[in-house]
């Protein structure tokens, strides 16, 4: 199933919130991404429909196995890119 780039960003942010706080709340995702709460509400509805997350009666979000796989892939990709860019800048500083 094809997932939108914006949805990948939301899932990655949700994983980061889970790792940082131990739980995922919509308000934390909104603050982390710099978006409005209604934007997060819209995204979570889409992610629930696609089976990437569940939400309990208190509004706490849980990544499903599928959602966790996408989120972990995105987080790993960003960590790899960050490490690469830091290595490139570090090499240029030495050469410069």
Task: Annotate each language-model stretch with its function.
Residues 26-57, 65:
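Canonical helix-turn-helix DNA-binding module
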Residues 8, 72, 76-83:
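Generic detection of well-ordered alpha-helical segments
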Residues 59-77:
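Basic, amphipathic "hinge/linker" alpha-helix immediately C-terminal to the N-terminal HTH DNA-binding motif
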Residues 79-96:
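Amphipathic alpha-helical dimerization/coiled-coil segments
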Residues 2-35:
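N-terminal helix-turn-helix DNA-binding core of bacterial DNA-binding proteins
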């Amino acid at each position: 199933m094809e997932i939108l780039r914006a949805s990948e960003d939301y899932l990655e942010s949700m994983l980061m919130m889970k790792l940082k706080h131990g739980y995922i709340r919509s308000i934390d995702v909104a603050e982390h991404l710099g978006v409005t709460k209604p934007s997060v509400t819209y995204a979570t509805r889409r992610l629930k429909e696609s089976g990437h997350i569940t939400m309990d009666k208190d509004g706490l979000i849980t990544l499903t196995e599928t959602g966790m796989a996408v989120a972990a892939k995105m987080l790993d990709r960003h960590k790899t890119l960050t490490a690469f860019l830091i290595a490139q800048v570090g090499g240029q500083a030495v050469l410069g």
